[in-house]
């Protein structure tokens, strides 16, 4: 079976932050065995000592912890996709989510009160950084609390990259979860129309193209046509106006109304959104070195 040398070099580089030439040599000296190559790099002092605190953590994973009255969504970042898929890392992210759920902490100012396995949250993250060998960063969390006659829904994509929480009126847990699943899949920017900046609404209205005969219609009909056009545009990015992914004959707003329910709150995370990633063209770099 042929050895995928490029993939092996990429893996060792991601795990060690070693230089390209050193990584290539370590694999050659170790008969292309990744674990032996890492040992070779360590024993020969070739692993870069770049400060982890200065490196960018743009990969990572999400986790959700939930009970009947509270739900927590947390994002923790790492440097590489390799670590993001690591079971030890994913288990640690879930451990943090569970601790946040139990702590009843609702804001960043109180995070120092969270204790995990006898240490503070910051210490837990620092220990994880030391154990895994990459910069691990606690990025953010959000919690929703259900009051009387309210229910929470939660959905996390199997790859741990997308998660959503919703709160609705009533006690229909399946409905709440379906709306959370929709929010995760359809990526709304806002929950409610009244959250959309007025300037953006005006831009959408200005984009309206009058249909033939529009000027001859009564004012109330013109207003309905204009509102219909606006609602169609809002449906692209406002949760309550979006067509329900399971039954697109209903908007989320109407779906909940038919179930005597109401959308109260929602939040959606995607790992790394808003973080500028450092992109390395491993293929080009490896090809250049392999030809030397």
Describe each model-derived feature in a short phrase:
Residues 2-292:
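N-terminal assembly/interaction segments in proteins that build large macromolecular machines
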